[in-house]
A protein has these predicted regions:
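Conserved mid-domain beta->alpha element of the FAD-binding
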Residues: 1-12, 16, 20, 97, ...
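Residue-level detector of anion-binding/catalytic polar loops
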Residues: 16-17, 51, 107
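Short, well-ordered alpha-helix to beta-strand connector turns
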Residues: 14, 105, 140-141, 263
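Conserved FAD-binding catalytic core of PHBH/FMO-like flavoproteins
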Residues: 98-99, 106, 115, 122-137, ...
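Residues in the short beta-alpha loop(s) of Rossmann-like NAD(P)-binding domains
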Residues: 23-25
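C-terminal helical "tail/cap" subdomain of flavin- and related membrane-associated enzymes
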Residues: 280, 295-376
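Active-site-adjacent segment of FAD-dependent monooxygenases/related oxidoreductases
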Residues: 29-104, 118-121, 324-327
């Protein structure tokens, strides 16, 4: 997603670029991805002139926070009229592919393997790769690593250059895509039995997230258990079973690598930082990286001015750490407020008081809205 977005911004600005993608277009188009486009990202697409072409889905303005089955609707405070959208990452990727390839005639090469990076100090960067036609190599000015946690970009940086900051929360989420739409508002729920969330994934489907053990796998969660736990954690016996299309297990953890650049290689999104999905900020932080980097690359290409590029890491990291803190707070609060065997009844009651604050304190509500919208 971040690579396609960056390429679209550069192409719009007249800056040439090549996108290497390890899988074919058909698989890219159907691959399921989580994410909601926050208000800051909507504003970003508007500023690049692509919002009308890329964004779709209902406005993301409300969350139903439920404690032991009792729901309260949190409405984000929008002083500037810039709401987020429930445009899923899969929908955004498909729109980006159509715009970049079919409209802009951008250069994207699918099904590549054996990607290798040469980022030497005394010559221009080189990238080599293979595809069905054979081996290839090209020379470029900059390499942008949008290849996620296990890609070749960060791995190409010598040992000792980057510092890794990480935290493991000690539990995981089961993410289940189901044939059942969200009938009201998106849900973030807790009960003494644990955490559960339901978020929309198109008009007919939704994705449920259930707190589980790090050691759990598909054999531990047959479909019947998934629905039993959803009913139990939402305290709602009227919820009916539906088809479960897929199940993923996501460990709750946070990671930041710094700096996010080395010579002419720049890291973006999951290649540089990971967040627990509780705050829905992973995709939006990647889009923030893309926005800052795209502006810097355009400035370097048009004006031969590298100042913004050289300052890329120091520009984006303070924002990333703010949202790491927000995501950690959301994760701790939503899970401490649930199953008391997690961290005890004191932490449970303190976390539930934090949730009460969102509805009792205008100051807390405004701050929470700023983070939800990506505008803090």
């Amino acid at each position: 997603m971040s690579g396609l977005t960056l390429a679209s911004f550069l192409r719009t600005s007249g800056v040439a670029c090549v996108v290497l993608e390890r899988i074919d277009r058909a698989r890219v188009e159907v691959r399921q991805r989580a994410g909601v486009v926050d208000a800051r990202a909507v504003r970003m697409f508007e500023q690049w002139g692509l919002a009308d072409k890329l964004l779709a889905g209902p406005l993301a303005q409300t969350i139903d926070y439920r404690v032991n089955g009792v729901g309260r609707i949190f409405e984000t405070i929008e002083d500037d009229g810039s709401p987020g959208r429930f445009c899923t990452q899969q929908m955004l990727v498909n729109n980006l592919l159509r715009e970049l390839i079919d409209v802009m005639a951008g250069d994207i090469r699918f099904s590549v393997t054996d990607v290798s990076i040469q980022n030497d100090e005394d010559r221009r960067p080189r990238v080599s790769y293979s595809d069905a036609a054979g081996a290839h190599e090209f020379v470029c000015d900059y390499i942008i690593g949008c290849d996620a946690e296990h890609g070749v970009s960060r791995a190409s940086i010598p040992d000792g250059v980057l510092t890794k900051y990480s935290h493991d929360f000690g539990y995981a989420w089961l993410a289940a895509l189901v044939e059942a739409p969200v009938t009201g508002h998106p849900i973030m729920g807790v009960s003494d039995h644990g955490f559960v969330a339901q978020l929309p994934r198109g008009p007919h489907r939704s994705r449920y997230y259930l707190q589980c053990a790090l050691s759990d796998g598909p054999a531990d969660w047959p479909d019947t258990r998934i629905w039993d736990e959803i009913r139990l954690r939402l305290c709602d016996n009227t919820i009916e079973n539906a088809v479960v299309h897929d199940k993923d297990f996501v460990p709750m953890r946070s990671v930041v690598y710094a700096p996010m650049q080395y010579r002419n290689l720049f890291l973006v999104g999951d290649a540089a930082h990971l967040l627990p999905p509780t705050g829905a900020k992973g995709m939006n932080l990647a889009l923030y990286d893309v926005d800052v980097l795209a502006q810097a690359l355009v400035r370097a290409a048009r004006d031969h001015d590298r100042a913004a590029l050289d300052a890329y890491s120091s520009t984006v990291l303070p924002h990333i750490w703010k949202y790491q803190e927000f995501s950690a707070w959301m994760t701790d609060t939503m899970h401490d407020a649930g199953d008391p065997t997690q961290n005890g009844t004191f932490r449970q009651m303190a976390a539930r008081a934090c949730l009460d604050n969102l509805f009792d304190s205008p100051t807390a509500a405004r701050l929470h809205s700023e983070y939800q919208r990506g505008l803090n």
